[in-house]
Amino acid sequence: MADRKIIAVVGATGAQGGGLVRAILADPAGGFAVRAITRDVSTEKAKALAKLGAELVAADIDDPASVERAFKGAYGAFCVTFFWDHFSPEKEKAQARIMAEAAKRAGVRHVIWSTLEDTRKWVPLSDGRMPTLMQKYKVPHFDAKGEADKVFAELGVPTTYLLTSFYWDNLIHFGMGPKKGADGRLAFTLPMGDRPLPGIAAEDIGRCAYGIFKRGPAMVGQTVGIAGEHLTGGQMAQSLTRVLGQEVRYNEVSPETYRGFGFPGADDLGNMFQFNRDFNEDFRRPRSLEGSRALNPRLQTFERWLEANRSRIPLG
């Protein structure tokens, strides 16, 4: 490890961080070693990464001292937050600052900050097209990350800003997969109209991040968007039909209807889909499929991801 550049990966047992850890470990000749950062190094997921060869370090992104210790001696750091743990944009911004300040103090030479757009640049709080949430946000889990971009910049942290896309894994873990209606037919529900939604396999986010680290200092200061495909709800339903072997229809609903579904975060996600729909070209433009594949030649299509994961998708 001494002659390899250490990449400290926050959220190493999570969707994005785990993909990066595995990408680094799968490339022993790549010149990098991985430091897997997680709150609890005793979990089965953490132990599995250690068996693959990762260095495990316990740190909590709410605890500045622990993050600085975890970043010390690292060449690079992958910084990510998980809004859905707490539903607090204020906490998310505080965590981003803790990581940025720790990277600065530790002398990290290349940070990747997993971010999203601040939608208020398109839809000001005064704009009534979508409701304002928590008094200060339109899409809280987007806006907090986008607002935090400036923290890395103001501190002079050498950062690449990674714009992610809709996780196809949400069909497994977030209850967004096809559901049976009263007629017994499966329906895939999105409030996207006929507009394409950039999506990606969560594992590929980490692989793309690894591609950024391999390119090195030339990527510092750049904003890089990634996606596996841009697909309409209808196209996704067609793929689900082919792979699952049973008909799945696209159930197009309005953002208003989606916001009213009542599950935790439904209002945030309803606004997110409305932003993606109403500003579709602006949202899709930075998420280049060609650029994503250049970073990650193993980039999966939606159907390829479905074929590998169909048994994991609950069909309610």
Residue map of PLM features:
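Universal eukaryotic N-terminal targeting presequences
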Residues: 1-2, 315
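Oxidoreductase cofactor-interface core, primarily capturing Rossmann-like NAD(P)-dependent enzymes
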Residues: 2-48, 62-72, 76-94, 101-112, ...
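Short, functionally important structural connectors and interaction interfaces within domains
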Residues: 53, 189-192, 223, 287, ...
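Short, conserved active-site loop motifs that form the nucleotide-linked donor/cofactor pocket
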Residues: 53-54, 159
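Cofactor-binding loops of NAD(P)H-dependent oxidoreductases
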Residues: 59
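A hydrophobic C-terminal alpha-helical subdomain
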Residues: 219, 244, 255-316
